[in-house]
Design a protein with these regions (language model features):
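SAM-dependent methyltransferase catalytic region
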Residues: 23-24, 28, 32, 40-312
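Conserved small/polar residues in nucleotide/adenosyl-binding loops
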Residues: 313-317
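Long recognition/docking surfaces used for binding and targeting
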Residues: 1-45
């Protein structure tokens, strides 16, 4: 985590307006993080980029999805502030490292209040979708700059959740979100951290093997597991990876995927000539999103999907 911390300190000390002056004119891109990361990953590890399905999402697409989610929250869920909503709900959650025979899973429960509109990007990448959500929410505070500082700490950061598997993307996401929040005038506390975690969204946990890096991974996994277990995610959005030859074959996600291998509303096997495509990573991320929305009893799933989603019979499942 020191890489993220040190990089963030460098950006805090820099005059970013001078750094960014003329950027778009020189690169024909408006996002410096994407410009850096695309070039870096293409040169450093193009095979990993292909294997992980890591591709740039056009800003216009990101803006459209975030704007649409905001409007649906207002129109269909009766939340006038949309993505900026501050309402809370009461939930019951398990307490880690507790044992209590009074509960079926052996864990003590506690009742807590948590924000209703929780956002999750399970394939965060460089943080483009979460950053766009921050920008759109900030626009709602036009002329109310004095309220922004308190709002971010109390009502925004606790609702922004992200999972990312690649260390480079994870680092860039933290830098981007720190940068965009600073640009809005927000001043972060020293002990404050973003809820973007280094983890595989399609797995349940990492075991701590004792090394310093493993301990770091364990802390990240614990943060992600808290979201997977206890957070009532209402909005799942992003651009998950596509990979027909998926390497994500963990027991948890494959068990969830069994629901997609049956004819709709039956227990009959899916009648598909080549059903292996249901195991594409993007299908698994759709199932992950459905898992969160189902658990919350309501919500929005807003992904950029492979075009085959609209063309293959498999998608009917």
């Amino acid at each position: 985590s020191w890489i993220v911390d040190d990089s963030a300190e460098i950006f805090r000390a820099a005059d970013m307006r001078q750094v960014m002056a003329g950027f778009g004119h020189r690169t024909q891109q408006t996002d410096p993080m994407i410009h850096f990361y695309e070039d870096f990953l293409a040169a450093y590890d193009p095979k990993q980029r292909k294997n992980r399905g890591v591709w740039y999402t056009p800003q216009a697409v990101v803006s459209c999805i975030v704007k649409t989610v905001d409007e649906i929250l207002q129109a269909e869920f009766n939340l006038p502030m949309g993505l900026a909503d501050t309402s809370k709900i009461t939930v019951e959650r398990s307490i880690d490292q507790s044992k209590d025979k009074r509960f079926s899973d052996g864990k003590k429960k506690e009742t807590v209040k948590i924000h209703k509109v929780q956002l999750l990007d399970p394939a965060t990448g460089t943080g483009t979708f979460l950053a766009e959500a921050v920008s759109r929410i900030h626009d709602k505070f036009n002329g109310q700059a004095g309220m922004w500082q308190g709002y971010v700490g109390e009502h925004l950061l606790p609702r922004l959740n992200g999972f990312e598997l690649l260390m480079t993307s994870y680092t860039m996401a933290h830098l981007k979100l720190d940068w965009i929040l600073t640009e809005t005038g927000y001043k972060a506390d020293d002990n404050e951290r973003l809820r973007v975690f280094l983890t595989n969204s399609l797995e349940e946990h990492h075991k701590d093997t004792g090394t310093l890096f493993a301990q770091f991974l364990a802390r990240e996994a614990n943060g992600a597991n808290e979201i997977k277990r206890n957070t009532p995610v209402m909005v799942v959005l992003g651009n998950p990876p596509y990979s027909g030859e998926s390497k994500n074959k963990g027991e948890w996600i494959m068990r969830l995927m069994e629901d997609y291998k049956k004819e709709p509303d039956t227990n009959q096997p899916l009648k598909e000539r080549n059903p292996k495509w249901i195991n594409d990573d993007y299908c698994k991320f759709i199932r992950l999103g459905q898992f969160f929305v189902d658990r919350n009893n309501e919500g929005i799933l807003a992904y950029v999907n492979n075009h085959s989603f609209c063309l293959l019979y498999t998608s009917d499942a």
